[in-house]
């Protein structure tokens, strides 16, 4: 069996070319940092994008990609997730697909690095500092005096992911001056119906326009890359535009997205190294040692 390791950075995937191009940029920048070739591979969806919109190179998704690599004699894969928190996509879907492949591919070895944010490590404020940098840049660009901050994520079916959002909001609140930013609130873009998913509340549409969030508002985007939800014309922007129609005094601005900040590479590079020393998914018996690059 080949000892070669294929390194991937993975997101959930999107039908929008901007998301794949952003993931490719992250892969290149992370590869430069760690001295390895990093492949940009989404979990799902992205192969629906026309290659013409991706510089002629088709997008890759996880299962077909690793099967293709098998034909090249590659059986070892190391995944760095571009997920802020412990999403089911990484903790459940990907391991399930690996286990489903293993009966006919016993050599398959997949190690998954930790997600971007460890909510149990209160001393690590790097992700919060990225958000703060982008909030300050937005405040200065718009010449806001004392804006409120709505820190918004997509919304998730797993409470552990929402706890990451809330953890970051607490850190951002501590890092910002209260006199300059009187309100910092965590919210979600959307949620599933039912009481089981009420932990996603409040929704952005219920925050923007209420007292304290009806004048100057910065929408801090806990999104990695542009797509259907984030970026110009996305769902978050539409929610804000609709709120502005009902509240003429509302001045709002979204921050830039996380993937564009150099600080995310510092975090991903650390997670990359941690992933090299993680246990392979579903591995039984003696765990093979990988050499760090």
Model-inferred region functions:
Residues 1-293:
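Extended amphipathic ligand-handling, pore-lining, and cofactor/metal-binding catalytic surfaces
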